[in-house]
């Protein structure tokens, strides 16, 4: 690998790593204050779980030579312990292995949307290993493993047989995580109270900003080096993020009366999800359109979720699953032959076979991810209890599972502290939810005003 290409992949790796604290802050801000630390733990522990299993056998499952030549799953022993990529052979294989660790880990972190505030942490760790092995790894092999006839290497069927176009993981990462998060949410059931509003919008702002920065590495690094393709997909990603932000604010204004900051952050991420499978296959104007489309579809899906009381806490199915579908279908219809991928959508004279190949890949991805995740969670629940007790849920999962609290609010509603096993216990008068404190103070102020 050319040194300049390796330098860009290393830089992209660093950018993608920002998505983990970013997702922690985004998700932590979206729940009540008594769930923040558990949310952080679920996201960050994904990196720990996946790093271990990926080094042992995961890289072989994802990018190993397909067992039997069927394109279903790679050989888990081919890269066992990374033993055969420990020397510099000029291919950059070790760096790519690290890059794919981040892809797998962020996918698992997204699935935590279906478990937020109610899943035992130990059960989450076990679930993460099983989910990577039986859900993520096969899907990633189908999409990321590319045939090499000269060496006899056989990759995944979806990429090589179906010839499905997915630039950077719209299927293996986003649709997969969306369907899996929905399945996990259904198995676990709803929280006792779903009426908790985002407790900290500044956390959401910081988290969304880090995720956007990480996405430039996510898509840009997939280009494989410091080249025109990398610059192209970074720019289309930026444009799609803008389209998502504007699209979500518009539909929010039309249907809800006012555009919100939270909505603009959601739309931005939906736009980035939508461009992920399409970043190299659309024009700059097409990138804006696909971002806006992803946001509109996500808005509709979030509204549907609320109407059906599905407790997908961070809307992973609406934002990642549905926007990912929108991006893939956009390529099918509006792929621009002048873009680097050279894929012509149906409206640009492309093959009519796109009309069944792209939807087939989407349907298989959603069905497999949802079905196997539901099966894993259901069976696991027979052997170990997945959900915390009602008492622990009311107390707050941070205290129940981690013996810590993100906030300690005194009688004036200010102050921060934390309790660990190594420090003093926080007094019982602690109020865990900063939003509720604000509501109570406002009620007091209104009462005083009315009495004057």
Swiss-Prot record:
Gene Ontology molecular functions: ammonium channel activity
Subcellular location, principal: membrane
GO CC terms: plasma membrane
DNA-binding in keyword set: no
Membrane topology: Multi-pass membrane protein
InterPro entries listed in its UniProt record: Ammonium/urea_transptr, Ammonium_transpt, Ammonium_transpt_CS, NH4_transpt_AmtB-like_dom
Induction or repression: By nitrogen starvation.
Domain of life: Bacteria
Residue intervals passing through the bilayer: 6-26, 43-63, 94-114, 126-146, 167-187, 201-221, 228-248, 259-279, 282-302, 314-334, 336-356, 360-380
SUPFAM superfamilies referenced in this protein's UniProt entry, alphabetically: Ammonium transporter
Localization annotation: Cell membrane
Keywords: Ammonia transport, Cell membrane, Membrane, Stress response, Transmembrane, Transmembrane helix, Transport
NCBIfam families found in the cross-reference section: amt (TIGR00836)
Physiological role: Involved in the uptake of ammonium/ammonia (NH(4)(+)/NH(3)).
Family designation: Belongs to the ammonia transporter channel (TC 1.A.11.2) family.
Subunit details: Homotrimer.
Name of this chain's protein: Ammonium transporter
Organism whose genome encodes this protein: Corynebacterium glutamicum (strain ATCC 13032 / DSM 20300 / JCM 1318 / BCRC 11384 / CCUG 27702 / LMG 3730 / NBRC 12168 / NCIMB 10025 / NRRL B-2784 / 534)
Gene name of the encoded protein: amt
